[in-house]
């Protein structure tokens, strides 16, 4: 019996796959537990339509990520921060991923989730710093930060 998997089933198939499985296994386990449904012409048509819309959505997300990358990497889009600096040259406060995301939103109107900013530890130095950002699984960008001493 041909079935369309609605969820991943270990050792049998992944979500969206169409496979031939034994009739008893399909009826008594897969279909009963809503892990798969019978592969009728209508169900196959629905699956193909759903896959096309998912591909289109993924392409739109990729295009949006590339557009944001271009915006972030423009030379004039340098994020400015001013912090108090101690005698050792380190800032009293630190620049976190949350602060960077808020700064991008406030200064340039670019909305990025703070979890996409790949900051190993908060920045406590002054000067020009580049921070990597993962916008999409295929698109990475660099945010340029200019951290100044507030006493200057």
Swiss-Prot record:
Gene3D superfamilies associated with the record: Ribosomal protein L9, C-terminal domain, Ribosomal protein L9, N-terminal domain
Listed GO MF terms: rRNA binding; structural constituent of ribosome
UniProt-listed InterPro entries: Ribosomal_bL9, Ribosomal_bL9/RNase_H1_N, Ribosomal_bL9_bac/chp, Ribosomal_bL9_C, Ribosomal_bL9_C_sf, Ribosomal_bL9_N, Ribosomal_bL9_N_sf
Keywords: Ribonucleoprotein, Ribosomal protein, RNA-binding, rRNA-binding
A GO cellular-component term linked to this record: ribonucleoprotein complex
Pfam family, one: Ribosomal_L9_N
Domain of life: Bacteria
GO biological process: translation
Function statement: Binds to the 23S rRNA.
Family per record: Belongs to the bacterial ribosomal protein bL9 family.
Protein name: Large ribosomal subunit protein bL9
Source organism (scientific name): Streptococcus thermophilus (strain ATCC BAA-491 / LMD-9)
């Amino acid at each position: 019996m041909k079935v369309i998997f609605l969820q991943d089933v270990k050792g049998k198939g992944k979500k969206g796959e169409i496979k031939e499985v034994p009739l008893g296994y399909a009826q008594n386990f897969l279909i009963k537990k809503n892990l798969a449904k019978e592969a009728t012409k209508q169900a196959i048509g629905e699956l193909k339509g759903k896959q096309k819309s998912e591909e289109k959505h993924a392409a739109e997300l990729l295009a949006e990520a590339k557009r944001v990358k271009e915006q972030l990497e423009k030379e004039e889009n340098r994020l400015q921060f001013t912090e108090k600096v101690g005698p050792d040259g380190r800032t009293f406060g630190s620049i976190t991923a949350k602060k960077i995301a808020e700064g991008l939103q406030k200064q340039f109107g670019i909305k990025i989730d703070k979890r996409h900013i790949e900051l190993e530890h908060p920045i406590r130095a002054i000067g020009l710093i580049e921070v990597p950002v993962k916008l999409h699984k295929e698109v990475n960008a660099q945010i340029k930060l200019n951290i100044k001493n507030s006493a200057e």
